[in-house]
Amino acid sequence: MNQVADILKLAIKAKQQGIDAVLATVVRTEGSAYRRAGAMMLICEDGRSVGMISGGCLEPHIIKRAFWLTRNGANVQVYQTGDDIQYADDGQAQAGVKRTKSDIYDRSDNGLDDDSNSGLDEADFDELNFGLGCNGRVHVLFERLTTATPLLETIRNVRRTQQPITVATLIRANDYQHQGSVSQNRDNLQIGMRINLDEYRSLGSVSALGKTAFSSILANTVEELAEYKLSDKNAEYVTVENGKVTTEWLVQRLQPQLRLLICGAGNDVMPLVTMAKLQDWHVTVVDSRSQYATRMRFPQADVVMSIPLDDRETLLKLSNNAAVALMSHSLSQDRARLAILLEHPDNYRYLGQLGPRYRTERLINEISMNLSNPTMLEAGIHKLHYPIGYKLGGDGPEALALGIMAEINAVMHNQDAPVSGSHNNVSDI
């Protein structure tokens, strides 16, 4: 499932067909949650839907209620994923005091009256409790397609330009002067409003407006948010206090697709392309043999091309900030590609060589013999994963692809996988 790609495609179709839709976005999680902040789901009024914001537990309710929840505009709902019987806290649990219905289902910033839940019956409240045993809370922003379009267009532009953008989404605004949560107050703080923090403009604006374009409260808030730097996360929940107004934001670093460059166009590359595309990666397949590098053989790949072995410029361009898998089954091809890549270890994020360890060591020795200063390859060799992939068991191209994808995922997401730590744990294929 290409979650983001499928959402973008369906949004375009719905707009062209004049069909309304609701975008549901996870804006905050507490405790255990299946999806992280930023996960999205698009629900069309004709019944079509794509994307997931949970493991399938919340989706039936969300599909059922999406249009009802957004009848008065964007709003945030909070879903409990604890046990069937929920308690307010540990002390009350011991005393046998259960949560009330209002504790189990939190309305938030939707501009609705206090009795707005009157349309929900007992069965609905039982459903909203979601006795899943995960002991978490999932905050979900609901908005109609017209409101969400600027965000979807921004995501599409990020994927096209390969340039990340930092966006802040307002998920709550408490105006203490007016005693309560508001969906729109005198400073035009609208739930679901989004700001491009890189350019100081609201999403959907044609040009950068600068700090002075915002109201006094919002201008100070935007300035504080712009100084907020995401560390190792792509999304963060941020609270900003500004005078009598407290705002809560989801700050996201919208990233381009992860990119995979596969050098080699053999049959064993096909399942690797499929697995990468299932995760919505951008996949390029190259080979110097034009009869192998064809669109007919790799219809799922984003780019398929034949490039000469001595085309250094194209190889470095395609491998920039990407994961690279050398899988040609050809000594001459692997030697040529590896020689170029080992000299530029800072150009890519991952480099793996297919084949047994002794084969790769032979390639490295042959490359080193042609250099006046072989030590220049040390950084590249240190970064090289060989043999490529984790040894997970199984046999055949699919098992190989699974091990390769697992290792690349771990490296690209800076995770220490349980089987990592030594080249001896990878498969000698």
Give names to the regions the model predicted.
Residues 353-429:
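Adenosine-phosphate binding glycine-rich loop
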Residues 286, 323, 328-334, 340-366:
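ADP-ribose/adenylate-binding Rossmann-like module
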Residues 310-319:
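Short amphipathic alpha-helix with an adjacent loop that forms part of the alpha/beta core around
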Residues 273-275, 297-298, 317, 336-340, ...:
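Short amphipathic alpha-helical segments
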Residues 60, 270, 335-336, 361:
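Alpha-helical elements of the RecA-like P-loop NTPase motor core of helicases
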Residues 268, 291, 359:
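Conserved Rossmann-like nucleotide-cofactor binding loop
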Residues 1-288, 296-301, 321-323, 407-411, ...:
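Segments forming oxygen-rich coordination pockets for charged ligands
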Residues 302-308:
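Conserved SAM-binding strand-loop segment of SAM-dependent methyltransferases
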